[in-house]
Amino acid sequence: MPRKLPFLVSHLIKNVPYVCRPSVANGVFPALGIHLNQVKFELIDGTEKEATFMSVNIAPQSSGKSAVNKPVEYILADIVEHDKVNREREQEWKDSMNKKGANKEKPKRPDDLCVQVLVSDMTNAAFVQRMNDAKGKYLYTNLEEIELLRQLHTNGTKDVGKIICLCFDNGMYGQERVGTQSVTARVALRWNWNASTTILKGQKFFRGSLVDGTLSRLNISTIIPDKTKPFVYGKYDEQFAADLKPYIDRLNEARGTVVCREALRMAKRMLDKCQREGDLTGDDVYQDLSYRAVTIAYLKAMVLYIAHGMQWSKEIEKFAEWSLNYDLWCKCHYFGDDMTDEKQKERVVHKRGRQNMLEMLPERFTEDQVVEVRRRLGLDDDAKNMLRVWVYRKYIQKDNDSGIYRKYLNKKC
């Protein structure tokens, strides 16, 4: 991490163990982001984006993944207090509903019950109801375990990748029901969240959805245990909350489209650097991940820009650059090999059906040459059965003495 950090980041990580600070420095942004309401940022491609953050901490068991919880608790304190009032009002409405007889007119549910901080155990209907109640505000959940994402449904299926894509793009989400007491709503998905997982479970969870844009929309962090450093937490008290309050207040007060030319120039430099490194190394995975990683780092810089009173600083810039490199390192380190494998399979599927293996072979060829062609297409090495079929169908003939195969003229398989 940079030695000198923006005050807000430095303040939020100062009480967590040293080895946890990089992950916490990234993990606080989902909670910071939900304080922004009706705020958009101009991107380098001319579009606008809201402060959407989905942070996943992938680290060994008992490594301190919960270190982010206390800073997040203080960040969300004002919103949780507001939620408490609306939760009580909602419970009063439920109680009055239960007191009414079956033939009595039921009281209408209040339409201003905005609750932004949700528990991790929720039904899809409850989630849709909370989004509808929020009226454009962001929701937040600390999912603890990444598997809890499967509670939610898109198109009747537990499609985690689709939910992540909708979150990042603020896509439309909801459900359609016919019952009078059922939740029917369809709204733009504004939901920031934190989740954690162990390394093997995380790799298994995302396997099969690494090249469809799912991983690139996440912000990944990790914890590398260091047994030589003591695992000690600092003190969270009223002074900690008081020092944090001005920064939270500025986020709450912000409105409209926020533009910072220094931040845009930084984002352009970061993207150019990533593309240059990808070109020089020939690393397709790095290039695929870099564009959205730059966007995520830029959004962090803009949140800090607002929180620090619309003041740009070298500390914000250096932190954003470090955050980008850290995010890309974590993604490539934990998922790079699997992404490469999935990309290769995708290429094979794309080509399959359009490439005639017989046309890829010379007029005279051996079984070894057929095996090589099959490998290039991602097939297994067993060519014997295919060659027998080709001989039977008179696409080729075999010289039993030499073992050489020869194509029949004007024949194609």
Kindly give the residue locations of the regions a language model identified:
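Phosphate-handling catalytic cores of nucleic-acid transaction enzymes
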Residues: 1-413
